[in-house]
Amino acid sequence: MKKNIRIAVDVGMIVLLPLLMAYSLVGETAHEYLGISMFLLFLAHNILNIKWWKNIFRGKYNYIRILRLIVNILIFIIMISLTISGIMMSRHIFQFINIEGSSYARMIHLLASYWGLILMSFHAGMHIRKIPYIKRNILIPIFVLLGIRAFIRRNIVDYLFLKSQFVLIDFSQSVIITICDYLFISILFMIVGYAVTRLLRTLS
């Protein structure tokens, strides 16, 4: 039962990622509700995996465990930053909270959202035990190419390093295309996370 709940929570977070990234096309109100849903799923994910946090200072650390610790702590910081900055910028659900500094909140929210996309996808990939027929699976290189194409087309590097503080949205594109692009980027970094974990496992 607990395993099924854990899977449902993880799948829910993966589904919400591309939807949240397409916020301008989805709408501000929907984005805020999706953001709250993501934070609640994040809390549920950590509660379901509370043993991992309890065992941080126990046992030996190999390469994989060190990487997981770094990624998990960064994701925790990112999610807290997204939640606080999101509440500060809210024009709908939390509009009654009037906090100054929305320009800083917007910059933090932008930075955290794109790093969150990368690291949460990477984190998910680290927990994939095995990709069936990976050497003969033609879908892997296809997803990698689609992910790289979307990564470049969406100027992700500019947002990761705040070279651009405003997300350029092409409103002529359909919501589906935008969501698919972010989904492909997410899948790309899941594959990267999976590959890095396998490499570290051979070195351990």
Where are these regions (language model features)?
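Membrane-embedded alpha-helical bundles that constitute the cytochrome b-like, heme-associated redox core
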Residues: M1-S204
